[in-house]
Every structure is written in C-alpha cells, then in structure tokens.
Amino acid sequence: MNPEKFILELSKHNFVLTDKQKEQFKLYFKFLIEVNEHVNLTRITEENEVYLKHFYDSITPLFVFGDVFKDGATLCDVGAGAGFPSIPLKILKPSLKVTIVDSLAKRLTFLKDLIAKLGLDNVELVHGRAEDVGQNKLYREKFDIVTARAVAKMSVLSEYCLPLVKKDGYFVALKGPKAEDELDEGKKALAVLGGKLIKDEELTLPGTTEERTLVLVKKVKETSKKYPRQAGTPRRKPIC
C-alpha cells in the first residue's frame, strides 16, 4: 500500500486527508525509518508495508467503532511502542487527547521527538509499566478510550487496560486473526475487571489475505482496587 493507495482507501471510509495530514504521515514514515537504524522500533521498514501494517492497521478502529472516538475524547494507548495505534489515530482525529504509556525510555524519546516533528498537541507520554500506571490515581479510570495493539493475550491485556478506562468508557484491542479462542479464554478477566464484550469484528487488510480482529469492550462497572496486580503478575498468572 503506497501513500496514494493509503489516501484512496481512507477516502472509501469518508476520511479525506488534508495536505497537512498527508505530510504528517510522510514525516512519520521518514523519521521512523531513520531512528529505527539505531533504536529497535519495528521490523517493518519498507514504505508500502509501513503504510499498510502500521498506519492503515492502526486506524481501522475508526472504520468499525467510529462512534466511540468522539471529538475531544481522552485516549490512553498502552504499550504503544513506535506510536501504534495512537499516533495515526491522533493524526486523523486531532481533537483526541492522547496519553501514551510505555515502559521503554528509548521508545518514549522517539515519540517525544516525533510529536514535535508532527506538530501534535495534547499528547502526554508516561514512562512506566501498565500495572503501575493503572494503580496511579492520576490515570486510573480516567480515560474514555484505552487502546492496545499486539501487546499481550486478552486475559492479560484486560488487566493492563481496563483499570484505566472510566466507567461507561471503552477498551479497544487490535488483535490478529482468529481471536475467538483468546476471547473465550479472556471472558473471566473481562467480567472480573468490570468489562463487557460489545463486539468483535474481523477484517482483511486491503490487497492482502492478512486478517485482523478488532475487539470492543465497554466498562460497565468500576475495577476492584486489587487490580491491576503487581507488575509482572498478570502475565505470569492471568485471570482465567
């Protein structure tokens, strides 16, 4: 998917990019590849692949769960790495107020420089483990939307993300193909943490056979104060 095809595909979903947005994606790609030479940010480095598997993939929730991403909504991205999905979402929806949580300082340095280059405002970077941030009263149950892409399986991911979602807010997980087993396995964790599965939708990346699953969870009750547990525990002993 070259930049022109990317622009065309977005227009099919009623997203017509401005010149500024086109330039932001172009700068994003260039800076990602430049920094990736000395900081391990991504294995995907070819332009067509970055536009498809990072940029397009990151914004698919806007096509499927568009009503969730209201103007001015607060969004927390857990384990964003090189900024996916939150930075592409922010480029398309500039009114989003974004907080990015990541445990690696090198990635946050890249993101700080990227945000400046792209001229983005209302983006906060938080250095820490999701388990610790989820117990911090500055962030706990403060967000309308929490996103995570390719971070952990659903039973673990729910414990990272749901404590950050405010009641009646949403957790959006960007998963790979055939996530049914993972969703079944994660049902108990969702219930324990105050979440309710609203929808899971499969889609195929344009021009490929690569499948993705988008998962929408609503926060229907507050999360018990005992969650998230100590850093490392959710991965070692998932709720199941």
Curated annotation (Swiss-Prot):
It is found in: Cytoplasm. It is an enzyme of class 2 (transferase). SUPFAM superfamilies: S-adenosyl-L-methionine-dependent methyltransferases. It holds the Pfam family GidB. Its main location: cytoplasm. S-adenosyl-L-methionine binds at residues 79, 84, 130-131, 149. This is Ribosomal RNA small subunit methyltransferase G. It comes from Lactobacillus helveticus (strain DPC 4571). The gene is rsmG.
